A protein has these predicted regions:
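Charged, terminal alpha-helix-loop-beta segments
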Residues: 1-464
Length: 464
């Protein structure tokens, strides 16, 4: 008679949706076969070519560039340097939203030398007169268009900084800081200062940061003139509608579908830090969600078997079967680990790459930058009964955290002198203020170290 685990594995293998998902995530996109699936330059080249629209048989209203402009309008508020104003003039914005903007593409190029755009900026600065070496900085995607029909606007220039697995570059190395006030600045600050020097009253300049990250309220670029957009925005707004349209030949549709796979698949043949899913179709998001719902018990048993082996604990009868299950389904498990959908499971993240964890026998997936925030929510729920109404809320929770981690470090980034952060009636806002200091950098490293050494009964932290 089959054991419980054997029966679960039999049922797993019989399920057509499980087999379908396993087959999908065992595939390799053409970019992965070439070893460039997470390299920035090929993605920049792909989008530069697509935005030209040469392979798309449609009018300007349905062109990829028009829909790209729609994404910028939708995300313009992330460029917080403009305050309550907009980087896109009102008349132009109306034309973009109505898809009536009359533009003529003059140039779209990947890896455009910045000196070709801002030569005067580099050649006329008296502080750099003794610098003989040209600036070799490159703009990932450069777009220049002539504009007609918008009062006072004749040119549109878009500078796109594309980041796939890396963050924005900081100042150049000391030995390469030839131009004080430029080379010693972060990447987006350099690009904005140089390109903005060519601005004029009849030209609109838009600066864009493209990343796989979920777009928040404010751009993550150091220079806040950059509108932040995501690959998910481009997938939803440009690629998927194109596939369903009549604007493509079969060959072109196949090429775009293959690029969608590039975004969808976690690329297992490269180092772990680059195993990210850049964007996900609704179909795949739903498939992963349903996969976890169907197989939650089996996945938890498999993960516990893996932990027992790593810790040298006594194996159970079916552990070998469960370990073989993990090995044969590693592609699907990596897809789970790289997912960032809150409705899938609770996400707690290690900040570097996707991993699957067990917390109190519940399956958890680590894959985005909300580790600290979600831990703090959990910590608060477990300890809120200890809070006293006659004492500052943030101070109390902060003291509990310091005791938990055995450190004197303050864990929240609120202003101590601001009375509103000590209003015990305003606990939701206070808790929100504390969340902001938990997600990245040294705090995250301390948080993970603390969890590995000080886990209480209510929080068992296990890594697969």
């Amino acid at each position: 008679m089959a054991t419980k685990i054997e029966q679960m594995l039999i049922e797993y293998g019989k399920n057509a949706e499980n087999r379908k998902l396993q087959t999908y995530y065992s595939r390799k996109s053409y970019m992965e076969k070439l070893g460039i699936a997470r390299a920035e330059e090929p993605h920049s080249a792909y989008w530069a070519n697509l935005l030209k629209g040469d392979d798309v048989n449609c009018d300007k209203k349905e062109s990829p560039l028009m829909w790209f402009l729609q994404v910028l309008v939708n995300r313009e508020t992330t460029a917080t340097a403009y305050g309550t104003t907009s980087p896109i003039p009102a008349d132009m914005k109306i034309s973009i939203i109505s898809r009536t903007l009359d533009f003529q593409i003059e140039e779209i190029k990947a890896e455009k030398k910045i000196k070709e755009i801002a030569n005067k900026y580099f050649s006329t600065n008296p502080n750099w007169s003794n610098v003989s070496e040209p600036c070799e900085d490159e703009l990932d995607i450069y777009i220049k268009c002539a504009i007609r029909g918008v009062l006072g606007i004749e040119k549109l220039e878009i500078i796109v900084e594309n980041k796939v697995t890396q963050k924005e570059n900081g100042p150049k190395a000391k030995k390469n800081q030839l131009r004080p006030g430029y080379d010693d600045k972060c990447q987006t600050v350099r690009y904005y200062n140089a390109c903005n020097s060519t601005s004029s009253s009849n030209k609109v300049q838009l600066f864009v940061l493209l990343t796989p990250d979920t777009t928040g309220i404010e751009t993550t670029a150091t220079d806040k003139h950059f509108i932040q957009i995501s690959y998910q925005d481009l997938l939803d707004t440009i690629l998927l509608p194109l596939i369903e349209s009549d604007s493509l030949l079969d060959r072109q549709r196949f090429e775009i579908k293959d690029y969608v796979d590039v975004l969808n698949l976690p690329t297992l043949d490269i180092k772990e830090s680059q195993r990210i899913i850049m964007a996900k179709t609704t179909e795949q998001a739903d498939a992963i969600h349903n996969y976890v719902d169907r197989n939650r018990l089996l996945l938890c048993e498999a993960l516990k078997a893996k932990i027992r082996k790593e810790k040298g604990m006594n194996s159970l009868t079916d552990d070998d079967l469960l370990l073989k299950f993990i090995d044969s389904n590693k592609n699907v498990l990596w897809a789970l680990a790289c997912s960032s959908y809150a409705n899938l499971v609770d996400h707690i993240v290690d900040g570097k790459t996707g991993n699957i964890y067990l917390i109190n026998d519940e399956l958890k997936v680590y894959g985005d930058a909300t580790f600290g925030q979600r831990f703090l929510e959990f910590f608060y729920e477990q300890n809120k009964h200890l809070l006293k109404d006659n004492l500052p809320f943030c101070d109390q929770l902060n003291d509990m955290l310091k005791q938990f981690f055995g450190t004197s470090t303050s864990w929240y980034g609120v202003k101590n002198k601001d009375p509103k952060h000590y209003n015990v009636i305003d606990k939701d806002n206070d808790l929100s203020a504390m969340f902001g200091n938990f997600g990245t950098g040294q705090n995250l490293a301390k948080l993970i170290k603390g969890l590995n050494t000080n886990s209480p009964d209510w929080f068992r932290f296990e890594k697969l």
